[in-house]
Amino acid sequence: MSKTTEFIKIGDRLVIKPQGADYDLIPGKVYDLSYDRYACDDIFKENGELSLPTKIYTSKKDEFFKKRVLTYFNNAFTDTTGVMLAGTKGTGKTIMAKVLAKESNLPIIIVDPQYPEHRLIKYFKQISTPVCILFDEVDKSFDTEKMLDFLDGLQKTSKKLVIMTCNNLHKVSEYLQDRCSRIRYLRKYTTDDNLEFLDILINDMGIKNVEEVSKFCRENIKLLSMDNIVAFLNEVKMLEDEDTTLDEIISVMNIEHVQPKGVSSEEEPIDENDKDDEDDFDIEPIDYDDYDD
């Protein structure tokens, strides 16, 4: 009778060998790491590929930053390269995080915001394959001081590219920010970064009067996030053959914008010609004696 091995030895402990086939992490493939709090167990599974727009708009700063990060990671002797991308929503940091991850040509592990920080070091120390680890919005979901412990604990393991995004850098531990050996690269995004390719975006969408629309966006949209820009340009494209001004288009959209002169942000403008005569609103006093029995 053939004999099968049912146990593995870890230190002085014997553990029943789990069933299943051997599996190697695949470069470029996305994996999700989450935690089942009821079963007190990690959940690690495949998740296809990163979702990216068909066309990605990046600035010269983005290209320079990306090249520096990947060049260093590919040539560095250190085991972990930390990257922080900070900025308001819609400024491009999440797209850059995905682009960096994809172009690293590493297996990509996205860590669930609810995953316990104290388990991170132990889990990733078990992975000997070089990987890219993504943390989204660390300022909202993780204790960033503990993230420094995590980066410290990853040293002397296999090479790992750790990419973090945050909306508010002020909410990130100053100790994490000021440790270049852990977070080596920091890119701060502002809405002004989107201005670099605004005209290209307008032109790509086939909108007429590129200069006029570009000038209007720059002068009137208060938060030039990609979400606001694209939403507004879609409306412009849809209505450009109608007799509708850019001010009228943006006036009913959920985009904070500069009000045209003479228009209060609190109420609709009043056309003096449409005002009713004050006499029309006069009400004759009631003589209550008429109602006496």
Model-identified regions with their sequence ranges:
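C-terminal alpha-helical "lid" subdomain
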Residues: 1-29, 46, 54, 178-293
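Conserved catalytic/switch belt of AAA+ P-loop NTPases
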Residues: 139-181
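Pre-Walker A (pre-P-loop) alpha-helix and adjacent loop at the N terminus of AAA/AAA+ ATPase modules
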Residues: 44-82
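Short glycine-rich substrate-engagement loop in P-loop NTPases that contacts/grips substrate
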Residues: 63, 101-130, 144-145
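Conserved nucleotide-binding/hydrolysis micro-motifs of P-loop NTPases
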Residues: 115-116, 139-140, 168-172, 190-196
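Hydrophobic positions in the central parallel beta-sheet of the AAA+
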Residues: 83, 133-136
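Walker A/P-loop nucleotide-binding motif
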Residues: 76-97
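Hydrophobic transmembrane helix bundles of membrane-integrated enzymes that assemble
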Residues: 97-98, 102, 229
